[in-house]
Design a protein with these regions (language model features):
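Extracytosolic ligand-binding ectodomains
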Residues: 1-151
């Protein structure tokens, strides 16, 4: 699958050849454009994105509204994570009482805060302690949350 530009035609061609198989892809393929490229065969696709679906975030609808008003565009895939990353950085700068990168990095692993994407805390490798993957399928050519998997 790879990206929507390759996964869409692959999915469509497989269906046209009579291949009855699920097509599984990652975030590069997991787009609304995939439905256009794959046509009716998009029902054979299951794809994933790192993190909670915006529709499942407690503050997701409000963020979507404010984002649209500010940028005149729909929320891009990783915008909620970038939004939270800025707050993690600012929080770390405050706790370090510094803008020195070494001092900021020293306190960042101790971050514990509620963000748009959920609870933010890191393990000893720097990964989110409460990571999430969202699986999607397509119904009526619309990307739809299939399942949220908590890590």
């Amino acid at each position: 699958g790879g990206m929507d530009a390759t996964g869409g035609p692959l999915t469509k061609q497989a269906a046209e050849l009579g291949i009855k198989a699920k097509v599984v892809g990652g975030d590069g393929m997991c787009t609304e454009k995939l439905a256009e490229l794959a046509g009716e065969a998009v029902v054979n696709v299951t794809c994933s994105e790192a993190g909670m679906a915006l529709s499942k975030m407690a503050q997701g609808a409000d963020f979507q509204k404010r984002y649209k008003e500010r940028f005149n565009s729909d929320v891009q895939i990783y915008a909620p994570f970038t939004y939270d990353a800025v707050y993690v950085l600012v929080d770390s700068m405050k706790r370090a009482n510094s803008t020195d990168p070494a001092k900021i990095l020293a306190v960042m692993p101790d971050t514990k805060m509620q963000g748009l994407v959920g609870n933010i805390a890191f393990d000893n490798k720097g990964d989110m302690k409460e990571g999430v993957i969202t699986l999607y399928d397509f119904k009526d050519k619309k990307k739809t949350v299939l399942e949220v998997i908590k890590m």
